[in-house]
């Protein structure tokens, strides 16, 4: 089976000379105390930006930054700081307009010379107008499309959503294609969905089954084993009749959890023991030495325990393809990051294994351990990655032009 994105136009198929190019990127960067704390998303877009500029395009960049709920959000969510950082990284002048529609925008675009870059204001500023951006308002999409000759979508992180600045523009513009980052992400994920080397193992963490039920169900069909850790493991354990103490669980997902264990008894590998604490805090871990599989009433599970680390190590040792999404404990607490760190090391040390990691907290954990280069691919899009694994396609790809 061939993924549908292979039929879509790619940035290398486009002649950019003297054309005004609308580029949708994902500059949704973390900002702390008025400073950008990670430039990874900016760096990820550079190959596409340079391709357009170096080939004589007049570049207009669109991106969102956070969510906009009221006018009070606007000053904190301006893309000005990102435009300034992009100028610093590229070593060239970047024009910025604190608007994204209207005469000032049109005038600035009309004055662009080939090789120049203009960054428009946060697309979600339009959400103050009846959620026009997030609800893919047709008039807004048509307007943004009217500003350029070509549309390139390189915002992988938003491809699972139909917004005015992705689906809207692509629907109404004459020429469109996907950028380098989008193709790189889709190529990496396609390897494990459509043609994984086996054994193919998945590790799924995070707090809630409800957030990941789609991907868990899909992976139980596609993978050879699915290893479950994180907070969601306690829902599975309670469903099987184990005592879980004060641990979080989803009451309305107990039946579902039990049915998955019954349907996939050999594929679904659940955490055995846990590192425990009397409250949700970064305390010295406790362990139930008498009965590691159960959690006393006054304690809650905060991380996978040593038995589970060894269990996971044993299952993963012959893996040829591994997907990991979600931390296996409360990794932001130093005392409960051990499980996530140990599993990261296990995967990093596997030979001839194609490994993909996604999810912000999981990625932060491997970066903290200096293991980023030991993974085959680090995905930039959490929700988009999950949606593509579940469906083999993404809504944002739909209106992108087909290859000739």
UniProtKB/Swiss-Prot annotation:
Residues annotated to bind substrate: 26-28, 41, 64-67, 124, 161
GO molecular function: ADP binding; ATP binding; phosphoglycerate kinase activity
UniProt keyword Transcription regulation, yes or no: no
Provenance organism: Mesomycoplasma hyopneumoniae (strain 232)
Keywords: ATP-binding, Cytoplasm, Glycolysis, Kinase, Nucleotide-binding, Transferase
Record EC number: 2.7.2.3
SUPFAM superfamilies documented for this protein: Phosphoglycerate kinase
Gene coding for it: pgk
Name this protein carries in UniProt: Phosphoglycerate kinase
Pfam family, one: PGK
Classification of source organism: Bacteria, Bacillati, Mycoplasmatota, Mycoplasmoidales, Metamycoplasmataceae
Keyword ATP-binding: yes
GO cellular component: cytosol
Domain of life: Bacteria
Subunit structure: Monomer.
Gene3D superfamilies named among the record's database cross-references: Phosphoglycerate kinase, N-terminal domain
Top EC class for this record: transferase
Family matches, as HAMAP family: Phosphoglyc_kinase
Binding site for ATP: 212, 301, 332, 359-362
């Amino acid at each position: 089976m061939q993924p549908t994105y292979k039929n879509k136009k790619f940035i290398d198929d486009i002649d950019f000379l003297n054309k005004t190019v609308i580029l949708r990127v994902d500059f949704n960067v973390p900002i702390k105390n008025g400073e950008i704390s990670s430039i990874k998303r900016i760096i990820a877009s550079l190959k596409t930006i340079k391709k357009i500029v170096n080939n004589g395009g007049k570049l207009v960049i669109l991106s969102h930054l956070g969510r906009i709920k009221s006018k009070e959000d606007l000053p904190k969510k301006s893309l000005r700081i990102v435009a300034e950082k992009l100028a610093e990284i590229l070593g060239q002048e970047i024009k910025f307009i604190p608007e994204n529609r209207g005469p000032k925008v049109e005038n600035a675009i009309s004055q662009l010379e080939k090789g120049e870059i203009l960054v428009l204001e946060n697309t979600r500023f339009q959400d103050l107008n009846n959620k026009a951006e997030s609800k893919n308002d047709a008039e807004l999409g048509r307007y943004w499309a009217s500003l350029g000759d070509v549309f390139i979508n390189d915002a992988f992180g938003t491809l699972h959503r139909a917004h005015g600045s992705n689906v809207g523009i692509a629907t109404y513009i004459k020429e469109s294609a996907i950028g380098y980052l989008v193709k790189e992400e889709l190529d990496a994920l396609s390897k494990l969905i459509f043609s994984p080397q086996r054994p193919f193992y998945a590790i799924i963490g995070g707090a809630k089954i409800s957030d990941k039920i789609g991907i868990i169900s899909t992976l139980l069909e596609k993978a050879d084993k699915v290893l479950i850790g994180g907070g969601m493991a306690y829902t599975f354990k309670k469903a099987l009749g184990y005592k879980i103490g004060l641990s979080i669980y989803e009451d309305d997902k107990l039946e579902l959890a039990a049915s998955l264990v019954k349907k996939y008894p050999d594929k679904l590998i659940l955490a055995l023991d846990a590192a425990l604490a009397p409250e949700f805090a970064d305390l010295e871990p406790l362990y139930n030495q008498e009965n590691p599989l159960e959690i006393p009433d006054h304690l809650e599970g905060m991380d996978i325990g040593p038995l589970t680390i060894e269990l996971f190590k044993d299952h993963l040792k012959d893996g040829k393809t591994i997907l990991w999404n979600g931390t296996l404990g409360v990794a932001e607490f130093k005392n409960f990051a051990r499980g996530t760190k140990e599993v990261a090391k296990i995967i990093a040390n596997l030979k001839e294994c194609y490994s993909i990691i996604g999810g912000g907290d999981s990625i932060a954990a491997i970066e903290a351990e200096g293991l980023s280069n030991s993974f085959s691919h680090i995905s930039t899009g959490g929700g988009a990655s999950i949606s593509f694994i579940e469906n083999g396609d993404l809504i944002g790809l739909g209106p992108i032009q087909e290859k000739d």
